[in-house]
């Protein structure tokens, strides 16, 4: 894996920080769920990202106030966003960065353990295949090396 992946417009050094992530994803607070990119292997089509889970997350106000737990659907969304960063880097490298990707399918989702404030969620996404404007990914979310959630995720690109 290279420590300095390149795109058509800029040279990126790992880790990729939140400012660069915001340049690649359309999401913003409170729905931007990726804080840092730790690893990027464009040959293996794999990315590892980080989400720092804070008690200040708005979803903890109602899920659940007395026992805050990160909703599983948001863990899946965080995985999809990590995959989105990888896809956007690949597209911008190939001159096709005008697509906006939407999650269109989730299969085989499993939630093995709760994610709570203070956890560091590691998001590991691998692109399994790409068919035209569709990307199929497998993702695992880990806390302290333990898989807390996993899923097969499909996203579709639409011209923005």
Swiss-Prot record:
It comes from the Bacteria. SUPFAM superfamilies: Thioesterase/thiol ester dehydrase-isomerase. The keyword Nuclease does not apply. GO terms for molecular function: (3R)-hydroxyacyl-[acyl-carrier-protein] dehydratase activity. One of its GO terms (cellular component) is cytoplasm. Gene3D superfamilies: Hotdog Thioesterase. Its EC number is 4.2.1.59. The active site is at residue 63. It holds the Pfam family FabA. It is found in: Cytoplasm. Its main location: cytoplasm. InterPro entries: FabA_FabZ (IPR013114), FabZ (IPR010084), HotDog_dom_sf (IPR029069). Keywords: Cytoplasm, Lipid A biosynthesis, Lipid biosynthesis, Lipid metabolism, Lyase. Coiled coil: none annotated. It catalyses: a (3R)-hydroxyacyl-[ACP] = a (2E)-enoyl-[ACP] + H2O. Belongs to the thioester dehydratase family. FabZ subfamily. This is 3-hydroxyacyl-[acyl-carrier-protein] dehydratase FabZ. It comes from Xylella fastidiosa (strain Temecula1 / ATCC 700964). The lineage of its organism: Bacteria, Pseudomonadati, Pseudomonadota, Gammaproteobacteria, Lysobacterales.
């Amino acid at each position: 894996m290279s420590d300095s992946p390149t795109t058509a417009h800029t040279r990126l050094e790992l880790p990729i920080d939140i400012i660069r992530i915001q340049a690649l994803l359309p999401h913003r607070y409170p729905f931007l769920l990726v804080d840092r990119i730790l690893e990027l292997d464009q040959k293996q089509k794999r990315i590892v990202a980080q989400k720092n889970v804070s008690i200040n997350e708005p979803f903890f106000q109602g899920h659940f106030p007395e026992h805050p737990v990160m909703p599983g659907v948001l863990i899946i969304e965080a995985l999809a966003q990590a995959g989105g960063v990888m896809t956007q880097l690949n597209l911008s490298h190939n001159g096709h960065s005008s697509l906006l990707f939407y999650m269109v399918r989730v299969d085989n989702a499993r939630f093995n353990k709760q994610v709570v404030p203070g956890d560091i969620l590691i998001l590991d996404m691998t692109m399994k295949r790409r068919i035209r404007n569709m990307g199929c990914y497998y993702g695992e979310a880990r806390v302290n090396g333990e898989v807390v959630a996993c899923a097969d995720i499909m996203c579709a690109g639409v011209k923005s």
